[in-house]
Amino acid sequence: MRHLTRSLLLSAAVTPLFAANYDSPFLDNTAPTISTTVSLGGQNFVNQGLVGVGVFATNVIDGRGDTFGSFSSFKVDHNTWRKNSNGSYSGTLYTLPDRGYNVAGLIAYPARIQQMALSFTPDYTANNVSQTQLTLSLQRTITITDFAGQTTTAVDPTGATTLQGFSNVATAGGKFAIDGEGLAIRADGSFYVSDEYGATVYHVSKTGQMLGVITPPQALLPQFTGASGYSGFTTASGAIATGVQTGGRRDNQGMEAVDLTPDGRHLMTLLQSATRQDNPADNNQGRLFTRLSVYDVSNNPTPTSPVGHYVVELPTFDRDGTGGSADRAAAQSEIVALSPTSFLVLSRDGNGNGSGDNNRPLVFKTVSFVTLTGATNLAGTSYATGYTPVANGISGTLDGIVAAQVTPFVNLLNPTQLARFGIDMNVGAEGS
């Protein structure tokens, strides 16, 4: 029986498949100390509920002298992960901030990775406890530098799409423009960092130096009408208008997540939500059919094309949670690869503190299993090498294309389990 020790926050609700629409808050009422099990591919996965919470100080300064900005992604270095004699766990956690401060527009924020010491002492009781089970301490900041040793930037990528011998990369002011979103760790200590601007994946050394680039399939590269005059990876308002950008990753919905399979042989990359050609109306509820690529990195860490390209259907929900029809797709924020054909994915609404609207309830925040068994592999077809759509928004995938199967597993919205750690699901409440 396999326990998901890689997950730091655990709670559960298990149903066969995603419903077409979650029209009211999707909550889990499993009591503390009660575990649940899901079987996938002959393995049992056990969810022991929410067993730990930690608080990280907001006044920490990183190695570049900036206030600490994370976590767009975080991954445990499995070479360091240990269970200690007292039942606690410890290891090294690497975290990735995105494009920096979002208070006065985009800035020249250099991409970086934060190395942290992690200690985790699970609390398996039903008692109300303080938020002290998980502790993190910053050890060092790894600045990502390009092939010439200069830092990257986070401003809008309006520059050329070729730099230092690499094509189809986002640039600005002669620098690589990176909005870091996904992180994976190779056995040799090097990293994969995915970029939301370009839907690109960078391979960087353990010290942060770029070693190579994985450019995405053509289907994920932005495409604009010829009359618009736009090209490249710009996210300017005129370029991303409906009817102007006709294909490729949607702005601010690029390569959100990457991870390596446990054996290190395959890299999975997942767009945050649907491409523009798969949702031509560019409405929020039509962003449900996203794209997954699988790369064989066993011999070459930066292959030129994927061995797998699949459609993954995200859940949809009523943003107000009042029983209405779907008006949003639950975009994904992270994946954990389990095998070349299965992974975990975190899909969620955008409701909650910091969303700018605390009047809406929390509706959907769930970690699910995804299996590629039976799904249509589109690698090498015009769906991947061109802009042939796989879907038309909410109307479903095209005939002959089978999306990956999704099974909910860990429902983060468990009021009872959250409350015992002092977390209030009332989005307007202090500490929620």
Tell what function each PLM region has:
Residues 19-432:
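Sequence/structural signature of beta-propeller domains
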